UniProtKB/Swiss-Prot annotation:
Annotated EC: 7.1.1.2
Record GO cellular component, one term: mitochondrial membrane
Locations listed in the record: Mitochondrion membrane
Species this protein is from: Formosania lacustris
Keyword match Membrane: yes
GO molecular function: NADH dehydrogenase (ubiquinone) activity
Annotated InterPro entries: NADH_UbQ/plastoQ_OxRdtase_su3, NDAH_ubi_oxred_su3_sf
Spans traversing the lipid bilayer: 3-23, 56-76, 85-105
Assigned protein family: Belongs to the complex I subunit 3 family.
Topology versus the membrane: Multi-pass membrane protein
Pfam families in the cross-refs: Oxidored_q4
Protein name as it appears in the record: NADH-ubiquinone oxidoreductase chain 3
Function statement: Core subunit of the mitochondrial membrane respiratory chain NADH dehydrogenase (Complex I) that is believed to belong to the minimal assembly required for catalysis. Complex I functions in the transfer of electrons from NADH to the respiratory chain. The immediate electron acceptor for the enzyme is believed to be ubiquinone.
Length: 116
Protein backbone atom coordinates (compact mmCIF):
# COMPACT_ATOMS: atom_id res chain seq x y z
CA UNK A 1 0.00 0.00 0.00
CA UNK A 2 2.90 2.33 0.73
CA UNK A 3 4.19 1.79 -2.80
CA UNK A 4 0.86 2.87 -4.29
CA UNK A 5 0.72 5.98 -2.09
CA UNK A 6 4.31 6.93 -2.92
CA UNK A 7 3.75 6.47 -6.67
CA UNK A 8 0.57 8.54 -6.42
CA UNK A 9 2.41 11.28 -4.50
CA UNK A 10 5.27 11.34 -7.02
CA UNK A 11 2.77 11.54 -9.88
CA UNK A 12 0.89 14.44 -8.29
CA UNK A 13 4.08 16.32 -7.47
CA UNK A 14 5.54 15.78 -10.95
CA UNK A 15 2.35 16.85 -12.72
CA UNK A 16 2.08 19.94 -10.50
CA UNK A 17 5.67 20.91 -11.29
CA UNK A 18 5.07 20.43 -15.02
CA UNK A 19 1.87 22.49 -14.89
CA UNK A 20 3.63 25.37 -13.11
CA UNK A 21 6.61 25.27 -15.49
CA UNK A 22 4.29 25.28 -18.50
CA UNK A 23 2.84 28.60 -17.34
CA UNK A 24 6.25 30.18 -16.74
CA UNK A 25 8.07 29.10 -19.90
CA UNK A 26 5.98 30.32 -22.84
CA UNK A 27 6.43 33.79 -24.23
CA UNK A 28 3.07 35.49 -23.93
CA UNK A 29 3.18 38.46 -26.27
CA UNK A 30 -0.23 38.62 -27.93
CA UNK A 31 -0.33 41.18 -30.71
CA UNK A 32 -2.93 42.01 -33.35
CA UNK A 33 -1.55 39.42 -35.77
CA UNK A 34 -1.75 36.58 -33.26
CA UNK A 35 -5.24 37.55 -32.12
CA UNK A 36 -6.72 37.77 -35.63
CA UNK A 37 -8.58 34.80 -37.15
CA UNK A 38 -6.44 32.68 -39.45
CA UNK A 39 -7.86 30.79 -42.42
CA UNK A 40 -5.32 29.06 -44.65
CA UNK A 41 -3.13 32.13 -44.97
CA UNK A 42 -5.90 34.29 -46.45
CA UNK A 43 -8.31 36.71 -44.88
CA UNK A 44 -11.73 35.10 -44.70
CA UNK A 45 -13.85 36.24 -47.64
CA UNK A 46 -17.18 35.04 -46.30
CA UNK A 47 -18.46 33.25 -43.28
CA UNK A 48 -16.02 30.63 -42.08
CA UNK A 49 -18.91 28.59 -40.69
CA UNK A 50 -20.26 26.38 -43.43
CA UNK A 51 -23.40 24.32 -42.86
CA UNK A 52 -22.57 20.80 -41.75
CA UNK A 53 -24.19 17.97 -43.67
CA UNK A 54 -26.41 15.81 -41.49
CA UNK A 55 -25.36 12.77 -43.54
CA UNK A 56 -21.81 12.97 -42.20
CA UNK A 57 -23.18 13.29 -38.68
CA UNK A 58 -25.35 10.17 -39.09
CA UNK A 59 -22.48 8.14 -40.49
CA UNK A 60 -20.26 9.26 -37.61
CA UNK A 61 -22.90 8.25 -35.05
CA UNK A 62 -23.33 4.86 -36.73
CA UNK A 63 -19.57 4.39 -36.75
CA UNK A 64 -19.40 5.11 -33.02
CA UNK A 65 -22.23 2.69 -32.27
CA UNK A 66 -20.70 -0.17 -34.20
CA UNK A 67 -17.24 0.62 -32.88
CA UNK A 68 -18.63 0.17 -29.38
CA UNK A 69 -20.32 -3.03 -30.51
CA UNK A 70 -16.99 -4.41 -31.69
CA UNK A 71 -15.39 -3.43 -28.38
CA UNK A 72 -18.17 -5.36 -26.62
CA UNK A 73 -17.76 -8.41 -28.81
CA UNK A 74 -13.97 -8.54 -28.46
CA UNK A 75 -14.27 -9.45 -24.78
CA UNK A 76 -17.00 -12.01 -25.44
CA UNK A 77 -14.72 -15.10 -25.74
CA UNK A 78 -13.66 -14.58 -22.12
CA UNK A 79 -17.33 -14.45 -21.11
CA UNK A 80 -17.63 -18.22 -21.08
CA UNK A 81 -15.25 -18.35 -18.11
CA UNK A 82 -17.61 -16.34 -15.92
CA UNK A 83 -19.91 -17.86 -13.33
CA UNK A 84 -23.01 -17.33 -15.45
CA UNK A 85 -21.82 -17.58 -19.03
CA UNK A 86 -25.38 -17.98 -20.28
CA UNK A 87 -26.37 -14.60 -18.88
CA UNK A 88 -23.33 -12.95 -20.41
CA UNK A 89 -24.07 -14.38 -23.84
CA UNK A 90 -27.75 -13.48 -23.50
CA UNK A 91 -27.02 -9.80 -22.82
CA UNK A 92 -24.35 -9.64 -25.53
CA UNK A 93 -26.80 -11.15 -28.00
CA UNK A 94 -29.51 -8.72 -26.87
CA UNK A 95 -27.21 -5.75 -27.49
CA UNK A 96 -26.18 -7.17 -30.86
CA UNK A 97 -29.82 -7.66 -31.89
CA UNK A 98 -30.72 -4.14 -30.71
CA UNK A 99 -27.89 -2.60 -32.74
CA UNK A 100 -28.79 -4.70 -35.78
CA UNK A 101 -32.42 -3.57 -35.55
CA UNK A 102 -31.22 0.03 -35.28
CA UNK A 103 -29.10 -0.40 -38.40
CA UNK A 104 -32.02 -1.96 -40.30
CA UNK A 105 -34.28 0.92 -39.23
CA UNK A 106 -31.68 3.49 -40.32
CA UNK A 107 -31.29 1.69 -43.64
CA UNK A 108 -35.04 1.51 -44.32
CA UNK A 109 -35.50 5.18 -43.43
CA UNK A 110 -32.83 6.13 -46.00
CA UNK A 111 -30.27 7.42 -43.54
CA UNK A 112 -27.46 5.66 -45.36
CA UNK A 113 -28.40 6.99 -48.81
CA UNK A 114 -26.23 9.84 -50.09
CA UNK A 115 -28.41 10.76 -53.07
CA UNK A 116 -31.79 12.33 -52.39
Amino acid sequence: MNLVISILAITIILSSILAVVSFWLPQMNPDAEKLSPYECGFDPLGSARLPFSIRFFLVAILFLLFDLEIALLLALPWGDQLYSATGTFFWATAVLILLTLGLIYEWTQGGLEWAE
